[in-house]
Amino acid sequence: MCGRFYIPADDSDEELQRIIQYLNRSHTAPVKTGEVCPTDTAAVIANSRRMTPVPFAMKWGYTLDGRAPVINARSESAADKPLFRDGMQQRRCLIPARHYFEWERAGNQKIKNAIRPAGSEAMYMAGIYRIIGDVPEFTILTREPGQFIRHIHDRMPVILPREATKDWLNPACNALEVLSAAVTEVTFTPLDGIRQLSII
């Protein structure tokens, strides 16, 4: 799954910098940078009404009465679920980040790992969104993990190579075909000193 990701305020990747700066200029409340958590307002790329990719500020997680926000959707079955079907067909988005975090069990502790595509400064996670009232909400699609991180978690976000990002935002392109191009070769870095005790 993906329950945390990271996008620095001052990123060496020029494209990420432009996205954050654009949103912070055009919105009264800045988007979250640093470690982004569920329900935070984050930077998301989606099509405008003119079908042009544009940065938007969206809340992370589909809000459902009496339940925790839905922050992830399984890419393999999302198109068949009423909650996600419209998003898969018409409301696709990209969530830019430097890396995402996942916790690995180690005895009675959990070790926090930063995970990112090998040799990449920025990554783009595939997502879908909806608008409730006037609030846009997004969820991140997940898939089976690459072989190098299967020991950490049994799911990972769908990370698209840059050449597939344009197709993902194009509703005329088959969603599952685009998602099949997802990046699976990732690296992980344990973050020393950042650990959480397991709840037993």
Where are the language model's segments positioned?
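Short linear sequence motif anchored by a di-proline
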Residues: 1-200
